[in-house]
Regions:
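Intrinsically disordered, low-complexity sequence elements enriched in Ser/Thr/Gly/Pro
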Residues: 1-2, 148
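Sec-dependent signal peptide recognition
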Residues: 2-10
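Generic alpha-helical structural signal
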Residues: 10-11, 195
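C-terminal motif of bacterial Sec signal peptides marking the signal peptidase cleavage site
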Residues: 13-15
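Active-/binding-site microenvironments in catalytic and ligand-binding cores
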Residues: 17-231
């Protein structure tokens, strides 16, 4: 039997205006709809190649007990950087927010989806022009909002080699990674000119696979902008 669990759901509020003070409509469904942007966790979940243990789910109990009632219980374990997950800013910025310190206002709000899938190559870097072109059509990225980058890489999910760019594991895999990410210039522009609480991308990292300095991580997380990966 394949057991699956989803750990994260993101809410897209289709608007480019500041988030409402009252989120009641989001939760009762009157202000929009819930969209699950996560990949399920299972034995086939794709992890960062140096996280080699993968997802583990162990059955502790399943069946009738001596007391006469049915009882099911499981234990799970997982490295941090696999499947759809949140990078807290402290991941690349010492002294910045840890997961439990991120307020709810840093995890929800109006979302903008910038689609670069039509031009994204395995080493594509999202540019300032990608962002300003989107704004020219849709308006300014929302204050207190979440920027989601669609590269089309989510369609490769399930094929580890196609998704990561290599079938290698461990440290030797890292130089062989190929997937799109956010360019350093675009990250700089965002922290200088816009007021986001989070970014997200449908690849294994907000930096592109060939990055050796993880500048998008460093720049954004230093400003307490969290990152969703493998969306």
């Amino acid at each position: 039997m394949t057991h699956r669990a989803s750990y994260l759901a993101l809410v897209l509020v289709a608007a480019c205006q500041p988030p409402p003070v009252d989120y009641t409509g989001v939760f009762d469904g009157s202000a929009g709809r819930w969209v699950d942007l996560t990949h399920s966790f299972s034995e086939s979940t794709i992890y960062w190649p140096t996280d080699t243990t993968g997802f583990e789910l162990h059955e502790l109990a399943f069946g009738p007990t001596e007391g006469g009632w049915f009882y099911a219980s499981y234990a799970f374990a997982s490295p941090e950087h696999g499947g759809t997950h949140l990078d807290a800013p402290v991941h690349f910025a010492e002294g910045q927010l840890t997961n439990e310190q991120i307020p709810l206002s840093g995890l929800m709000g109006p979302a903008a989806v910038v689609d670069v899938s039509g031009r994204a190559t395995p080493d594509y870097l999202v540019t300032v022009e990608d962002l300003t072109t989107w704004e020219a059509e849709h308006g300014q990225l929302p204050n207190g909002g979440i920027l989601l980058i669609r590269t089309g890489w989510a369609e490769r999910w399930g094929d580890r080699t196609a998704y990561l760019g290599t079938d290698l594991t461990g440290p030797r895999a890292v130089p062989e990674l190929h997937f799109p990410g956010i360019g350093a210039d675009a990250a700089d522009w965002l922290v200088t000119n816009r007021d986001l609480v989070a970014v997200g991308i449908d690849t294994p990292s907000i930096d592109y696979g060939q990055s050796a300095d993880f500048r998008a991580h460093v720049i954004l997380y230093a400003e307490n902008i969290s990152g969703f990966e493998n969306v």
